[in-house]
């Protein structure tokens, strides 16, 4: 892994910082685990735009990722580490002893030909998946389930990790990457280690065109619009627009949007740090 800053041969290269891709060992994905992916362009079934700033982008093929890791006791060998255009982390192709092939989110330190395993009896080593009840306190984890058997829902982006803090009855206290501390059922699974591609946050696109390749469209400022289009629009000259608001009129800075009656609030011990 690592990053490199390109030489300023062109204006688009001047500020560009890209990943090294040194950990990638295969460029052609496993055919049985790849599917076509249709882009919506931010439109719904009726063709109406429901999400702004989405459209275009390079054509992608979807890699089927195993987030459940429920083949307990069956060892798997890491065949390759690959690039996935649909996520910031790298993915690893596993060959199970029974012949099945799956993709998983690759953690930092995972090597080709390394053996990994899932289940209660698995050792707490990088790449292994265990129930939270069997993971030692202080261990760095990722790919955390919220309900047993549901599949990993949290801590899946490049470079992030959570930490097992303590145990409380049927729950395990986990410190999330945001700084939030919350309870998770001890039967839920998590994988050992931090997610790969840690330098992803240091990358810079260098030009607007590379953002378009990713499927993002230009974001027009509200103060540049007319009053009919945005609460911050209008005014003589370059007006400030008043208090920052969203297009729907909600305060854009400092307004809490989480539902106070959300069922999962009871599991949050300490809110995330701002």
UniProtKB/Swiss-Prot annotation:
Part of the 50S ribosomal subunit. Forms a bridge to the 30S subunit in the 70S ribosome. Keywords: Ribonucleoprotein, Ribosomal protein, RNA-binding, rRNA-binding. NCBIfam families: rplB_bact. It comes from the Bacteria. One of the primary rRNA binding proteins. Required for association of the 30S and 50S subunits to form the 70S ribosome, for tRNA binding and peptide bond formation. It has been suggested to have peptidyltransferase activity; this is somewhat controversial. Makes several contacts with the 16S rRNA in the 70S ribosome. This is Large ribosomal subunit protein uL2. The keyword RNA-binding applies. One of its GO terms (biological process) is cytoplasmic translation. GO terms for cellular component: large ribosomal subunit. PROSITE patterns: RIBOSOMAL_L2. It holds the Pfam family Ribosomal_L2_C. GO terms for molecular function: rRNA binding; structural constituent of ribosome; transferase activity. Residues 244-254 have a biased composition (Basic residues). Belongs to the universal ribosomal protein uL2 family. It comes from Azobacteroides pseudotrichonymphae genomovar. CFP2. SUPFAM superfamilies: Nucleic acid-binding proteins, Translation proteins SH3-like domain. Residues 228-254 are annotated as: Disordered.
